[in-house]
Curated annotation (Swiss-Prot):
It comes from Yersinia pseudotuberculosis serotype O:1b (strain IP 31758). The lineage of its organism: Bacteria, Pseudomonadati, Pseudomonadota, Gammaproteobacteria, Enterobacterales. It catalyses: 2-formamido-N(1)-(5-O-phospho-beta-D-ribosyl)acetamidine + ATP = 5-amino-1-(5-phospho-beta-D-ribosyl)imidazole + ADP + phosphate + H(+). PANTHER family: TRIFUNCTIONAL PURINE BIOSYNTHETIC PROTEIN ADENOSINE-3, TRIFUNCTIONAL PURINE BIOSYNTHETIC PROTEIN ADENOSINE-3-RELATED. GO terms for molecular function: ATP binding; phosphoribosylamine-glycine ligase activity; phosphoribosylformylglycinamidine cyclo-ligase activity. This is Phosphoribosylformylglycinamidine cyclo-ligase. The keyword Nucleotide-binding applies. Its EC number is 6.3.3.1. Transmembrane segments: none annotated.
Length: 347
């Protein structure tokens, strides 16, 4: 017998009206990220963006990323307002280490049932991250997919395109022995290592909202947005000859610094040059995590490392400090012996 009931998309769990409400909610914050190169507004099948005219040989640089299981912690604590900043930061920080200026950003927000308030909060954070990095939020996809996600769970991904002058690409090829390494301080764990963070919280039976570190909750420390270094780094690049920049993300010191080192080069890090922020000391103690594993999983307070000629190091620290960064000389580049590690951290 045929079912005569008339079904709609909403009956199947997809509320088009809610999606339209979300677009109306976010239009204002998205408009605040606009760049002069952007042509048109939200709603087109694709976003149009011209290249800035100041570039003679523009090279496009693209990247995509997520925020890992930091999102799970944010959902568990019902804090959705800063995860969008994390999303933008993870993408634009990867672009700027190559000397690229971020141009535009797109996001993907997927959920089983669209909660307009939650989605608007996340996308408002994305817009804030775009403002901090000077790139335009030109579009995105909101996917409501019944049966694909549990409860109120959602996932986010970001996509960014930037531009760099061909002759000014930073790829590490200029790194030489004697270069000094300058560190830029991190705001917290950023968006890496959160599966280990959550495991530590679980095995130590810790409620992050009821645990205090240096005057604020552990939850606040853990959900502190990833620092966006774009404006500080672009300003530095304009003024000094930068040989390489490493963004310390998944893989920590051991895996990210070698990505920008030529064969035969070694980064020698002076561990005594800085003190780990309290959140990392807490994680190491609560999880009984080895020193090697800490440096493999977390940034341990260092968000980026810049390599440049020794005679420019003091000026770099001065310029970065003036840009609002915590910056210091963290090590040097040396010639590596055959078979030696590319990163040495001296206690």
């Amino acid at each position: 017998m045929t079912n005569k009931t008339s079904l709609s998309y909403k009956d199947a769990g997809v509320d088009i009206d809610a999606g339209n409400d979300l677009v109306d909610r976010i239009k204002g914050v998205v408009k605040q990220t606009r760049r002069p190169e952007v042509m048109g507004g939200l709603g087109g099948f694709g976003a149009l963006c011209a290249l800035p005219q100041k570039y003679r040989e523009p090279i496009l640089v693209s990247g995509t990323d997520g925020v890992g299981t930091k999102l799970r912690l944010a959902m568990d604590l019902k804090r959705h307002d800063t995860i969008g900043i994390d999303l933008v930061a993870m993408c634009v920080n990867d672009l700027v280490v190559q000397g690229a200026e971020p141009l535009f950003f797109l996001d993907y927000f997927a959920t089983g049932k669209l909660d307009v308030d939650t989605a608007a909060s996340v996308i408002t954070g994305i817009a804030e991250g775009c403002k901090q990095s000077g790139c335009a939020l030109v579009g995105g996809e909101t996917a409501e997919m019944p049966g694909m996600y549990h409860g109120d769970d959602y996932d986010v991904a970001g996509f960014c395109v930037g531009v760099v002058e061909k002759s000014e690409i930073i790829d590490g090829s200029k790194v030489t022995p004697g270069d000094v390494l300058v560190a830029l301080g991190a705001s917290g764990p950023h968006s890496n290592g959160y599966s280990l963070v959550r495991k530590i919280l679980d095995v130590s039976n810790t409620n992050p909202e009821q645990t205090s570190l240096e005057g604020k909750s552990l939850a606040d420390h853990l959900l502190e947005p990833t620092k966006i270094y774009v404006k500080s780094i672009l300003s530095l690049i304009e003024q000094l000859d930068i040989h390489a920049i490493a963004h310390l993300t998944g893989g920590g010191f051991w895996e990210n610094i070698p990505r920008v080192l030529p064969q035969g080069m070694q980064a020698v890090i002076d561990e005594a040059s800085w003190q780990w922020p309290a959140v990392f000391s807490w994680l190491q103690h609560a999880g009984n995590v080895s020193r090697h594993e800490m440096y493999r999983t977390f940034n341990c307070g260092v968000g980026m490392v810049v390599a440049l000629p020794a005679e420019l190091a003091d000026k770099a620290v001065e310029l970065l400090t003036a840009s609002g960064e915590k910056a210091w000389k963290i090590g040097v580049i040396a010639t590596a012996t055959e078979g030696a590690e590319q990163v040495i951290i001296n206690p």
